[in-house]
Amino acid sequence: MSLEREEPQHFGAGPAQMPTPVLQQAAKDLINFNDIGLGIGEISHRSKDATKVIEDSKKHLIELLNIPDTHEVFYLQGGGTTGFSSVATNLAAAYVGKHGKIAPAGYLVTGSWSQKSFEEAKRLHVPAEVIFNAKDYNNGKFGKIPDESLWEDKIKGKAFSYVYLCENETVHGVEWPELPKCLVNDPNIEIVADLSSDILSRKIDVSQYGVIMAGAQKNIGLAGLTLYIIKKSILKNISGASDETLHELGVPITPIAFDYPTVVKNNSAYNTIPIFTLHVMDLVFQHILKKGGVEAQQAENEEKAKILYEALDANSDFYNVPVDPKCRSKMNVVFTLKKDGLDDQFLKEAAARHLTGLKGHRSVGGFRASIYNALSVKAVQNLVDFIKEFAEKNA
């Protein structure tokens, strides 16, 4: 069986297309890793080889994001949904460990994923409230992020265990252009951000975040593993909250496998880490480094988003982009046709050109082009050409 393939043009939202060189190397390593006679999925997660994979991946991520010494990198099984739970209980405990009392978490709801994260915190009986729901500022629909002047009064002078946001909402095509200044400038607020769909797509200042979580299967690897970047001070605060105190205050206890200090203390291997999945993630890190790092990747991503949105806007009598231009996602471009009855034809003709994965999320319909890091400018240009031709033919 050959490890060669024609470069895909797959715009699926995740699991997403991956760099072919990464998959080729991973396939070889699954059979015989570093000439040790075993595949990487067969080695002990506590062996020297596995430990080196863990350490190398952290080293490469630190280089890519310029992660300061104030923060720690670790990995957990699961995905973003697992993180919804672990963030809520760990960060609630951190606040108790620091202050000896509880405070609500605050959620900025800009789409379905931040909404689901809030709902999970409530389900677990972690004190939580919505600071704003973007639907309230956009006629009952997601697709806009309200200016912070409209909601910053809701956080001034108020204690929160953390403030949560999803930087890029894949379903609704909404992305925060930057972190809200009112959060960044408040030393009492720990920002917790879900970067599952835009991690390593653009430069960020890690020092501004209390916790970053990112599921792997969109921009950095295969499903089943999530990376975390956390302030070391938060880890210390979590450890400072005893189970007895948490019980007395009614704060749920985090299951041991998802207790952040325990995971960090055991180098992400307290529970058997899927080392093959982590190795693939590290191969992605190395691939981006070889391309010129996050700065080069960001320039490429901005070019892809630019030509795609320009094509849709130039044919605005035929296509509709239901997202405020101020917060249009550079990762997930959502759009609909203004003419009824053509959706299936659009997908069929796109597939004939090997442009796949364009169907919109079942909850919103229409179309979604996910242009993650692994999608080339050429692939997006091919989609742009098709979008223009389809509009001309069916206007």
Swiss-Prot record:
Entry's cofactor comment: Binds 1 pyridoxal phosphate per subunit.
Modified residues (Phosphoserine): S112
Enzyme Commission code(s) on record: 2.6.1.52
GO molecular function: O-phospho-L-serine:2-oxoglutarate aminotransferase activity; pyridoxal phosphate binding
Cofactor: pyridoxal 5'-phosphate
GO biological process terms, semicolon-separated: L-serine biosynthetic process; purine nucleobase biosynthetic process
Keyword ATP-binding: no
Keywords: Amino-acid biosynthesis, Aminotransferase, Phosphoprotein, Pyridoxal phosphate, Serine biosynthesis, Transferase
Cystine bridges: none
Domain of life of the organism encoding this protein: Eukaryota
Ligand binding (pyridoxal 5'-phosphate): G80, T81, W113, T170, D194, Q217, N271, T272
Modified residues (N6-(pyridoxal phosphate)lysine): K218
Record's miscellaneous remark: Present with 15900 molecules/cell in log phase SD medium.
Free-text function comment from the UniProt entry: Phosphoserine aminotransferase (PSAT) is a pyridoxal 5'-phosphate-dependent enzyme involved in the second step of the phosphorylated pathway of serine biosynthesis. Catalyzes the reversible conversion of 3-phosphohydroxypyruvate to phosphoserine and of 3-hydroxy-2-oxo-4-phosphonooxybutanoate to phosphohydroxythreonine. Plays an indirect role in purine biosynthesis.
Family named by the database record: Belongs to the class-V pyridoxal-phosphate-dependent aminotransferase family. SerC subfamily.
Protein name: Phosphoserine aminotransferase
